[in-house]
Amino acid sequence: MRAQAGATDDCVFCGIVAGTVPCATVAEDATTLAFMDIDPGSDGHLLVVPKRHSTDLLDIPADDLAATTLAAQRIARAAITGLGADGVNLLNCSGPAAWQTVFHFHLHVIPRYRDPGRDRLRLPFEPGRPADAESIAERARVVAASL
């Protein structure tokens, strides 16, 4: 069993960290665990989680966020080298409206391929359709005022 703080009984990722739920482990250190996603968007899609439970991006302590992000970078490099990926997406979903389904902070490391046989992920928006400058500036003001 792996040690973890803040574990919840109903969190599948806490179970994976504790060793009570099976997974295909890729890498582990004192703070993080990386394992294969069971519903992959591409060949080699995996998840990186902090061992300490945090619900989402708004909840995670800065030290766990930094460690998880650095582990994801290391995994992304290995995916490109080891799997021959052409690129990688790093994804976090925070909250139900953002498609979060497991409420334990995690980063998806999704290797991307030019070969559609290895990659079923599609962007949920159309790039190349920028908003008007006034709308962008207004959103910047609203977010900045909330900092």
Descriptions of predicted regions:
Residues 1-147:
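HIT superfamily nucleotide-processing domains
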